[in-house]
Amino acid sequence: MTSLKRSQTERPVTADRASVVSTDGTPKVHTDDFYMRRFRSQNGSLGSSVMAAVGPPRSEGPHHITSTPGVPKMGVRARIADWPPRKENVKESSRSSQEIETSSCLESLSSKGSPVSQGSSVSLNSNDSAMLKSIQNTLKNKTGPAESMDSRFLMPEAYPSSPRKALRRIRQRSNSDITISELDVDSFDECISPTYKSGPSLHREYGSTSSIDKQGTSGESFFGLLKGYKDDRADRGPTPTKLSDFLITGGGKGSGFSLDVIDGPISQRENLRLFKEREKPLKRRSKSETGDSSIFRKLRNAKGEELGKSSDLEDNRSEDSVRPWTCPKCFAHYDVQSILFDLNEAIMNRHNVIKRRNTTTGASAAAVASLVSGPLSHSTSFSSPMGSTEDFNSKGSLGMDQGDDKSNELVMSCPYFRNEIGGEGERKISLSKSNSGSFSGCESTSFESALSSHCTNAGVAVLEVPKESLMLHLDRVRRYTVEHVDLGAYYYRKCFYQKEHWNYFGADENLGPVAVSIRREKPEDMKENGSPYNYRIIFRTSELMTLRGSVLEDAIPSTAKHSTARGLPLKEVLEHVIPELNVQCLRLAFNTPKVTEQLMKLDEQGLNYQQKVGIMYCKAGQSTEEEMYNTPKVTEQFMKLDEQGLNYQQKVGIMYCKAGQSTEEEMYNNESAGPAFEEFLQLLGERVRLKGFEKYRAQLDTKTDSTGTHSLYTTYKDYEIMFHVSTMLPYTPNNKQQLLRKRHIGNDIVTIVFQEPGAQPFSPKNIRSHFQHVFVIVRAHNPCTESVCYSVAVTRSRDVPSFGPPIPKGVTFPKSNVFRDFLLAKVINAENAAHKSEKFRAMATRTRQEYLKDLAEKNVTNTPIDPSGKFPFISLASKKKEKSKPYPGAELSSMGAIVWAVRAKDYNKAMEFDCLLGISNEFIVLIEQETKSVVFNCSCRDVIGWTSSDSSLKIFYERGECISVESFMSSEDIKEIVKRLQFVSKGCESVEMTLRRNGLGQLGFHVNYEGIVADVEPYGYAWQAGLKQGSRLVEICKVAVATLSHEQMIDLLRTSVTVKVVIIPPHDDCTPRRSCSETYRMPVMEYKMNEGVSYEYKFPFRSNNKWQRNAGKGAHSPQVPLQLQSPMISRVNAGKGDGKMPLPERAANIPRSISSDGRPLERRLSPGSDIYVTVSSMALARSQCRNSPSNLSSSSETGSGGGTYRQKSMPEGFGVSRRSPASIDRQNTQSDIGGSGKSTPSWQRSEDSLADQMEPTCHLPAVSKVLPAFRESPSGRLMRQDPVVHLSPNKQGHSDSHYSSHSSSNTLSSNASSAHSDEKWYDGDRTESDLNSYNYLQGTSADSGIDTASYGLSHGSTASLGASTSSPRSGPGKEKVAPLWHSSSEVLSLADRTLETEGHGMDRKTESSLSLDIHSKSQGGSSPLTRENSTFSINDATSHTSTMSSRHSASPVVFSSARSSPKEELHPTTSSQLAPSFSSSSSSSSGPRTFYPRQGATSKYLIGWKKPEGTINSVGFMDTRKRHQSDGNEIAHTRLRASTRDLRASPKPTSKSTIEEDLKKLIDLESPTPESQKNFKFHGLSSPQSPFPSTPTSRRALHRTLSDESIYSSQREHFFTSRASLLDQALPNDVFFSSTYPSLPKSLPLRRPSYTLGMKSLHGEFFASDSSLTDIQETRRQPIPDPGLMPLPDTASDLDWSNLVDAAKAYEVQRASFFAASDENHRPLSAASNSDQLEEQALVQMKSYSSSKDSSPTLASKVDQLEGMLKMLREDLKKEKEDKAHLQAEVEHLREDNLRLQEESQNASDKLKKFTEWVFNTIDMS
C-alpha cells in the first residue's frame, strides 16, 4: 500500500460498527445499539472500551452534543448523570490518580471527552465501582463489536497525542458541554504546572491523534470527533497534544503510561506491566467492598461467554495472576520463544486478537510527521473527507517521536525511525574484554560480535539440539547468522508429524480457542540418564508465542505408575504443565491429513508469512495439496525437506539515487541505471530474463513482460531473493509518481537505497509507504575503479528490533563477496525483524485466531481428554488415589531448556535486571523479561567452570569471560542450576586460593597469556596451596582475567601484596579446561584498540593465499608467490590446496602466534626469518598445535604470522645499546643448564627493534621436564597439549632470557614478566595482520612472567626445548615424554627419533621446504628471510627438533645456511632443516633464543642444519663481531645467499658482498670495525628500522659454537666424537663449510653452504644444539682424532684471496655433489657413515688448508693447484645449476598439473552432483 492511496486512518471505515460523517459534518452512527448511541450522545465521553468501537468518528467534536437536543435523563442515564455527588468527589480527591485511571480503564465510564485534569481525580466508592463494572459488562454484551476490543487501546491513554491528555477528570457527569470555567481552581493549577508539558497557554486546539495510535474497529477515535467541530472560541480548555506526556504527573505510578505500542515512549511490555499494577487495587477493592458481583457476571455470561475476561477471573484470581506467568520448572523448553510464552498475557490480550489496528506505519508515519510542522490547520492537504488528519505537530506535540538524532552523510535522523550508522553492536552483559574499560563499548562490541564464535543473541532460536545434530558451528565464524527466525516453528514437523501423537482442540473461557499436541516418546539418548519416557507438548493460543517443549515422565506427579507401557493420563500431564488450562474443554481432534496440515500451517505461519516461504513438500509434477498428502512418498519428501532445509523467499526493493537526489519521486524517475549502479547490481545478484523464469518471481510478470523484461535474482543460504530494481521496472514518461514502479517497491518491507557519490542523505520522510519499514542505504565510493568500495547505513521503523550483522564504525567495504554476503544477511535479517513490528504481528495474530477457531469448531470429535469423566459416580465408591511425588531433580537431565527466574548483572551498564536463565543440552541463554529478548547466549560446551554461593552464581565460559546471576525466588535455585551445569557441560566448581611469596618475592608458578598455569615449582608455596599445572586463572585479586591483558595480569601477580586467585581446576590428566571454541575454532584475538574493522576484513576468508598461516609460509618470506609456497602445504594439509582446507583444519593449523592476516609475506616481520622459520616450523610441524596454553602452546609458533608476532629473536637488549649477546651468553652459560637462573642480566627492551617485536612464540618453561606436549588429532588439530611447553606468543623461547627463566631449575618466580609485551609487535606500519593477527602475541608470555628475576638466556632449559621437541611426536602418533632427568641432548635425541619416523613419511612430500633467504638489503633494512615454498610440514617437526635442540642447548645460534632439501630435513633424523631458520630462528622463535651469538651482537648465528641422520651440517662462523661496514648485512646475505639462489625459482636480490669478502670477514675475525657493528643488522630479527648496534665486546676468545654434535660429544666425552667435532675443533675462528645437500631429486636441490662459526661455549659448557640429534648414534661412532685447531692466515699477510675463495667454492661444490650423490644412493645409511665420509673429506681439505696457512710461501705455491681444482669444481657447479634449473622446471610443471587436476576434480564433482540430482528428480517424477 502506498501513500498514493489514502491511508486507512484517512478513510472512513464502513464496517457495520463504524461511524461516518457526512459532508456537512453531521455524525451518522452506523450501529444497531440504540442505547449505546443515546449514552454516547448524552455524555459525549465514550468512556468505555466498548464504546470506542461504536464511537463517533475522530472528526466529531464535543460541540455537536450541545447542538442536538439532549436525551432526558431517565433510568440508568439519570443515575449516571447525577452520580457521583460532587462533594464526595471533592473529599475523596486525595485518592491516587492511579486508582482512578484503573477505574477508568476497567469500568470505562470515566469521561473521556470532558476536560479533566489528571491531578484531581475523581474517586468512586465501592458500590459505585461495582455498579459501573456491571453496567460496563452489560453494555459490552449488548454491543457485539465490543467483544473484539481491548480496553487498553481504547482509553485516552492509548492516544499519546489526544487532546484529553491535559484534561483532568472532574467531579461531574461526563457531559461534553463542560467548559474550562467549570474546572476546579485548585486542580486547574495542575494543568499549567511544570509537569504539564503540552503547552503553556489555555487555548483550544483539537486534532486527531497520530495515525499511529491504536484505533478501534471503526478506525476512528473519540478525539477525532472533537476536531471536526472545533471553533475558535477562546473559552475552551487547552488541548493537550500528547497524552503520554500529560500523564507524567508528579509521582503517580501510572505516569508516562501509554499503550501506544507503536509510537508510545513505553514499550508494550512496560505498558502491560503498568496495566497489571494498576489493575490490582481495583480487583481487591471490588471484591472486598462489594462482596460479590455475581449478578452482573451472570448477566454478562448469559449474553456471551467468550466476551472479555470473566468476573471469575477478575474476582477470584489472586494477585499473582498479574505477574508474568512462570512455566513449571519441570518443563524443558524447545526454543527461545517458548520461554517467552506468557499465559497471563495471552489471557489479557485475548480481546485484542481480532482488533484491526488501522495505523499509519513504516515510512508513512515519518512522512506524515514531517509534513505537519504547525497546527492541524496547516495539514489540510492530508485531511480525509471526515476531516481526520494525522496531527503530528512536531513542536507542539511532544508525543511525536523525534528520531534518534543519529545522522551521517548517508542518512538523516527521522521521526519514528532509528538509524544504524556504524559502531552499534549487540548488547553485552558479560564481563569480558569487549566491555571492560579499556575498550570503547560499541566499537569493540560490533567487532567482537562479528568475530564471536557463537550465535548472535537474535540468532538463537532452537535450544534443544539432538545429539546427532550437535555441531561445532565451525562455520559460524565466517558466516553471518540469520536472525529473528522462529525455527522452533518446525517442532511439530520434526517431532510430531507422522509419529504417534494426540491433538486436542477446545475453547477455554479465559484463553479462547486453544490447540494442544502431545506425544509420548522413548528417546534412545535418555535411557542412560534416567527417565526412559518423555512427553513432548505444544500448546497454542491466539497469541503468536507458543509453548513448545517436553517433560520427563518421572518429573510428573501422577496417580498412575511411571515408566509403564501405558503411560500417564494425559490430563495429569497437561494439568501439571499448564495448570491454568481448563482441560475439560479439550476434545480429541480428527486424525486426518487436513488437521495435520492445518496445524503445520498454524505453527509455521510466521515463517510462511514472514519469509513468503515456499515450503517445498510437493513432489515434482504435483500441484494440489491432495496429491501431496495422498502420495506414498510424502514421508520421503519431508525427510528431504528436513535434510535440505526449507527454501525461503524474500522480495527486496532497490531504489537508485543519483548525485543531488533525495526524494522518492526523483529516485523513481531515474529511467536507467548508471555505471556505478550497474556495477553494484552485478555484485549483488544475477540479471535474469523474467519471461519464462520459473523460480521465485516476487509478483513480477513472467509471461507478458508487463513488469519489465529483466530483474535481479540471487540466493543466499536457504533464501531466494528477488529484487525489485527501480530502473528495471517499467518507466512511465508522463507519470511523475511512477506507479508501476512504486506498486512493487512500495510494498516491499525492506528497500536498498543505492546512492551515487554526491547524493543527498536519505530520509524515510521522503517516502510514502505503509509497508517500507527498513531502508538499507549503500553509497559507492570511487565507483568503476579498482578501489571501489561501499559504505552502509540502516534506518528502520522504531518498532522494528535491531538486527545484525553489525555495521563496523567508520568502515567501507571493498567490492567483494564478503560485502555481498554482509549485505544480503543484513537484508534478510531486516525483513525477519520487521515482521516483529506491531503492524505485522497484529495481522499475523488475526490470521492465527482464524486458524484456531476453524480447528476448534470443525475438526474435533466428542472424545474428552479424560474419558473416565463420563462416569463420575464410579469414583465415589472408592477413595481418590493420591498422586505420587515426582522424582526430585528428574528434569535436570532433560534435553530442552530448564528455566529459572533470576536477577542478572549487566557489567556493561553496571545494573541488575530480572531475567530468565535457560539451560539446555546445547545453550545457556539469559532472556530479559521486560524486553522479552535474549541478552546473552553461549554454548554449554564453552562453559569451563562456575563459582557458586547460596544465592548467587558466576558462570565462566570460553576464555574466562563470565556472567553473574542471583536467585531471588528460592534458595534451592542455585543448587539446581549448578547440578544442571554439571549435567550439560564439562566445567567444574572454581577454587579460591591465597598465594604466598617466597623469600625472593616469587609466587612459584608460570602463567601463560591465556591465564593458564604453565608450570608450578614443586614444593613451593603455590604447589602447597594446591595449584596445579593446567589450572586456569579466572580471577586475580577479584579482577576477572578475561578483562586483563597479559601485562596487566602479570602486574597484578607481581605487585599485589596478597594474591588471591580464583582458578578453574584442570582435568584429571592436568590438561586445562578449555571451551569448545578454543579447542575447535580459531582463537579469538586480543584486539588492540583499532578494532573498527569488520571481521571479514581481517580474515580474508576468500583469498586462499591469506590463510597460509598453517603452512607457515614463513611469514617472513618476502612475498612468496602462492605457487612457491610449496605444495607442501597442501600436502601437509591432507591434500587440500593451500588455504582451502576446511575451516576446522585451518583453524587448527593456525597457531595463535601466527598472524592471520593476509598481508604480503614480506611485510610480516621476519625477525630473522630464520627465527621465524624456526619457530614457525616448530609451530607448524605440529601444525595443529593450537597454542594451547596448556602445552602451552607451542603453537604460537611463528608461523606465518610472522611479522606480527613479537617474537624477539634476541633479548630485547639486543638492539640499541645492549650488551653483546655473546657476553650475556657467556654469563649464563653454565647457569643456564642447571643454574639458579638468577644470573640474568636484564636487558632493556627496545621498542622498535624487530628483534623485540618478534618474541619467539614458544616460551618454554624453564623446567627441564618435557611432557608430551602435543597430541595431534586426526584432523590435525592439537587436541590437548600438556602444559609444559609454553610457547608464549610473545616471549622468546627461553632464549630471551628475560622472558623466561633460563635455568631449568628456574623457580618460576612471580615477578618477571612480560614487560615487553607492550612493544609493538608489528613492523613498520601495522597491516591487516596486525589487526587480525592473533595478537595473542601481543604480550603474552608463556610463563607467567612471573619470574622477574630470571632474565638470562634460558638456553639451558632443556626442558624448554625438550618439551617442544618431544611435542612433534605426531608422526608415529605416540607421545614420548622426556623425563625430567633427560639431559637436553637426550631430549633432542628423543625428538630426533620421533622426528625420524615422521621424517621418513614426510620427507618426500615436502618440497623445497623452508629455504630461507636471508638476503639483506645492505642499505638498511634487513629483508626477511624467506623460506622457499615456505611450508612447514613436518619438516617443521623435524626442524623443531633441530631448532629445539639448539634452543635447548645454550649453544649460540649459528646461522647456518645449510641447504637441505626437504628431504633432508625430513631425513630420518631431522635434517638440518632450514638452517637459518632454525638456526637462529630456532632459538628465536620457538626456542629459547639460546643462541645468542657469542661473538657480538652483530654476528648472525646460523644454526647448522642437521643432516638427516644427524650429520652435522654446519657449524659455522658466528663471529661477525668485528667486521667492516656493511659486513653485517652482507654476511648475512652471503651466508644464505646460496640457499636463496638455489631455492628460489625467482631471482633474488643478491648482496654486494662476495664470498671472498665473507670469507675475509669470517676469517679475519680479529679486525672488526665499529661500523660493521653498526651496520650489521640481525637479519630476520631486526626490523629495517632497528639495526642492532652491538656494543663492542671484548673478543674474549671466540668461543666457537660447538656444532651440535660436537657439543654433544663434548658433553659426553670432552673429545670430539661427532662428525662435527673435527670441524668444531677449529680455532674459535675457524670456518667450517658444512652444508647438507638434499638428495631429493624431485625437489629443488636446496643447497646452501652453511657457514657457521663455531664458538666455544664459555666455561666449557656444552649444550645440545641442533645437529646433535645423533645422540643415539654416537655410541656407534668412532671418535675422530682431533685435527687440532686450524691456523688461519694472518690478516696482514699477503694472500691471494681470490684464489682462496675459489678454492673454498670448489671445495664446497665438491662436497655438495658428494652429498647429493650419497644422499640419493644411501639415504638409508646411518648418519654416522655419512658424517664420517664428510668428516674425512673435510679433514683432507682442512689439513691442506691449515698446511697452506702455516707459511705464506707454501700457500702461494699451492695456488696453482687450487686453481686447477677450482676449474673442475666450476664445471661441476655449472652442471649442478643446470640440473637445478631442470628440476625447478619440473616442479613448476607438477604444480600446474596439480592445479589442473584439482580443477578437473572439482568439475567432475559438480557434474556428478548434477547427475545425482537429475537421477533423484527422475525417480521422483516416476
Curated annotation (Swiss-Prot):
Changing R743A: Decreases stimulation of the GTPase activity of RAP2A. Residues 638-855 form the Rap-GAP domain. It comes from the Eukaryota. Changing T1348A: Abolishes ubiquitination and degradation by the proteasome. GO terms for molecular function: actin filament binding; ephrin receptor binding; GTPase activator activity; protein kinase binding; protein-containing complex binding; ubiquitin protein ligase binding. PROSITE patterns: PDZ, RAPGAP. The modification Phosphoserine is found at residues 162, 187, 193, 208, 255, 288, 1117, 1126, 1155, 1166, 1188, 1209, 1220, 1273, 1288, 1344, 1367, 1384, 1408-1409, 1430, 1449, 1451, 1546, 1567, 1572, 1583, 1586, 1603, 1606, 1621, 1665, 1668, 1726, 1729, 1746-1747, 1752. Ubiquitinated and degraded by the SCF(BTRC) following phosphorylation by PLK2. Interacts (via PDZ domain) with EPHA4 (via PDZ motif); controls neuronal morphology through regulation of the RAP1 (RAP1A or RAP1B) and RAP2 (RAP2A, RAP2B or RAP2C) GTPases. Interacts with DLG4, PDLIM5, PDLIM7 and LZTS3. Interacts with the actin cytoskeleton. Stimulates the GTPase activity of RAP2A. Promotes reorganization of the actin cytoskeleton and recruits DLG4 to F-actin. Contributes to the regulation of dendritic spine morphogenesis. This is Signal-induced proliferation-associated 1-like protein 1. It comes from Rattus norvegicus. The gene is Sipa1l1.
